[in-house]
From Swiss-Prot:
Record protein name field: UPF0758 protein XCC3860
Gene3D superfamilies, sorted: Cytidine Deaminase, domain 2
Keyword Metal-binding carried by entry: yes
Binding, Zn(2+): 173, 175, 186
Gene Ontology MF annotations: metal ion binding; metallopeptidase activity
Motif position, JAMM motif: 173-186
Organism: Xanthomonas campestris pv. campestris (strain ATCC 33913 / DSM 3586 / NCPPB 528 / LMG 568 / P 25)
Family: Belongs to the UPF0758 family.
CDD domains cross-referenced by the UniProt entry: MPN_DUF2466
Pfam families noted in UniProt: RadC (PF04002), UPF0758_N (PF20582)
MPN domain segment(s): 102-224
UniProt entry tagged with the keyword Protease: yes
Length: 225
């Protein structure tokens, strides 16, 4: 059955317009970009097959546009639209931080780190430097490779914070394995940074660990006083 033969309130586009995007399943949202679907399949079925073969959703959407364009059921036009929509969503998410507004929602900072680091297939340790009103000054990737307590140099974080005249710092790093649970090394790094930054009266506000799903905040765990 073609999707146009479905009841109107079950078609993805009509459902989105009537009830909002949040009520659509992953397959229904993807079907809007798929368009007509493969021959003999409706768009939702094609989208489900894409998620089954190339998912989960994050793995599918982290692919560059050229890789998406090669997947059956997408093609160049749909892949470009999908990549453009993702980039617009990322820019919307990051806009408050990047235009210098005060940060009042810690979860938005975690999402910022997630968008910047999640897709990397190697570990990256980054810092967000803030002024005394907790407005973003700069975001920098400081260390890459295998991140452990021996690889993170607090002096470099302090040096960059002083260079930016920062009053506070939020740090974060990704776990390419997808497991965001903080390790003992992550906790050790956090304590070393707290001590080093404290010597120059700069606050460490949080340390986020990025993996699949929601970023883990060490401050929420009580490990950043």
């Amino acid at each position: 059955m073609h999707i146009n033969d479905w009841p109107t309130d079950e078609r993805p586009r009509e459902k989105l317009l009537a009830r909002g995007a949040a009520v659509l399943s992953d397959a229904e949202l993807l079907a809007i970009f798929v368009g007509s679907g493969l021959r003999g399949q409706d768009a939702v079925r094609t989208a489900r097959d894409l998620l089954h073969r190339h998912g989960p959703l994050r793995c599918l959407l982290d692919r560059p546009a050229k890789a998406l364009a090669r997947l059956p059921g997408l093609g160049p036009a749909s892949a470009c639209k999908l990549s453009a929509a993702l980039e617009l969503a990322n820019r919307h998410l990051l806009s408050d931080l990047e235009r210098g507004e005060a940060l009042s929602d810690p979860s938005s900072v975690g999402r910022y780190f997630s968008q910047r680091l999640r897709a990397r297939n190697y570990e990256v340790f980054a810092a967000l430097f803030l002024d005394s009103r907790h407005r973003a000054i700069a975001f920098e990737e400081l260390f890459t490779g295998t991140i452990d307590a021996a690889e993170i140099h607090p002096r470099e974080v302090v040096r960059r914070a002083l260079l930016h005249n920062a009053a506070a710092v939020v740090v974060g790093h990704n776990h390419p394995s997808g497991n965001p649970e903080p390790s003992e090394a992550d906790r050790a790094v956090t304590q070393r940074l707290l001590q080093a930054l404290g010597l120059v009266d700069i606050r460490l506000l949080d340390h986020f660990v990025i993996g699949d799903g929601r970023p883990v905040s060490l401050a929420e765990r009580g490990w950043v006083p």
